[in-house]
Amino acid sequence: MGRKGDLLALVDSAPGGLRTLQAALTTWSHRARIAEVHRRQDDAVGPGVRDPVPAVAVLPGAAAAHDPDDEDDEDRDDPVRPVAGADDEPAESLSTAYVVVALPDRWRVVGRGHLAVSDGRRSWAGTSTLVTERDSRRAAIGDAGAIGACLYPGAFLYRLDFTEPEPRDIEGRPCWYVAGHPRTGPAARQGPPARPDLRLQRELVGIDHEIWFDAATGVVLRHEGSIDGEPCSTTALTDLVFDEPVRADEFRPPPGAVVRSRHELLRDHLASMGIDPDTVDLDDPVQVRAALRQGE
């Protein structure tokens, strides 16, 4: 099958037999360049075709800015990083989070003043003092942000023409390095569809890419995205600990934190805007968006 074919198979099956992972997750982004990446991706899709990636400046690993056409938008409990798009944001952003994952459905991501955690049945998002709980039917590893894309890169390589894999290492761990750029023509449609919950293009942002895949599991250990030869995003896992036991209390809300449901917080928010929450079906995203716009 060849080295490229072997790498495709490895990445397709990621994270393979991985049981647990503990790491530091560092993300860097350049806001204006990311905005240009998304603009070009929108242009490539063409008129009348919805691009699954929001056409806004979204930081790698960041929660997407509000998209009025996304019915799940008000359910996105991804507070690990701030929403991008505000005019007063700095040109560049650098953040580091502590990540611990026990596959398939338990995780903890702790950033500066923000956290997201799941015990496999429920998930929580918020701060060390207040978290919002949501039903596990929406709890997927993609909710943990960039770590989801790193663990499940899936069809990412199928979108790229990439170089012959080169053996490298990160912190002494063997990996495969490739550089790639978007496929064009009929080849761009080949390969299996990407996992929709991971939003790969949003998390691993760039027109051109350099990627380091773990040789044993296929997970992304490092990604560097660029546009017109200029870097726009970096996502890196360091301080790696693979397959070591993890305590069960890692996957619970912080001790003493107030736990509230999304409905409770939404009701309070609507009331603070002068809107009677009893007049809004809080399970209907269309009604919720209309009410929020009314209160602006």
Question: Locations of the language-model features?
Answer:
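Short loop/turn motifs at secondary-structure junctions and domain boundaries
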Residues: 90-91, 158, 201-205
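Generic short beta-strand segments
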Residues: 24-31, 179-188
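A short, Trp-centered hydrophobic/proline-enriched beta-strand micro-motif
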Residues: 13-85, 107-109
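A short, structured loop/turn motif at beta-sheet edges
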Residues: 165-176, 212-217, 243
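An acidic-aromatic
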Residues: 61-151
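Short, hydrophobic/aromatic-rich segments at coil-to-beta transitions
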Residues: 17-24, 104-108, 172-179, 195-197, ...
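Hydrophobic/aromatic beta-strand elements that line small-molecule binding cavities or substrate pockets
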Residues: 95-100, 121-122, 165-166, 208-213, ...
